[in-house]
């Protein structure tokens, strides 16, 4: 899965965080840029399409707009939060935003490897640690802690893969933006 620019291809997935006492089921709606592994995350108590749209609308698209970069396509699995008729909220949102919706082959999660890898990282480095340290009574403080971790992941934590070569995701994106200007 190659992309020549930030925002050209994003991968999205919904990850079951757990059943939290007093809250119920909690899901992470994750989006990862295939260009430099920049990641976004929104916690919600459902897998509904509206929650999957919320992370795009509130976090992802404003980020790329600030950089002056278009979002070309989003790759998802075939989950109900992402797929349906043209009036499906996620499908409709992407169409109205002029973003291509690509889908993985059924039952082939490795096709969406960028976001699957991120899910493993966020599970190991954030959720397993925080859930042992903190009792969360609502989603909001957990989201605040996730937001702080995402700042670390995107701006402080070096990524050793061939795309970033030890750079942080924001460095990879900023490097592209500088070269294009």
Task: Identify the residue ranges that each predicted region occupies.
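C-terminal domain-tail junction helix/linker
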Residues: 1-2, 6-7, 97-99, 121-181
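Mobile-element integrase/transposase regions
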Residues: 1-32, 38, 54
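Short, conserved catalytic/metal-binding motifs centered on acidic residues
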Residues: 13, 37, 74-77, 94, ...
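A short acidic/small-residue loop/turn micro-motif
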Residues: 35, 45-49, 79
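Short small-residue beta-strand/loop micro-motif enriched in glycine and branched aliphatics
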Residues: 38-42, 102-104, 128
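Active-site beta-loop-alpha junctions of metal-dependent nucleic acid enzymes
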Residues: 42-67
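Acidic/histidine-rich, metal-coordinating catalytic segments
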Residues: 65-85, 105, 163-166
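RNase H-like two-metal-ion nuclease catalytic core shared by retroviral integrases
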Residues: 76-78, 87-94, 101-125, 138-141, ...
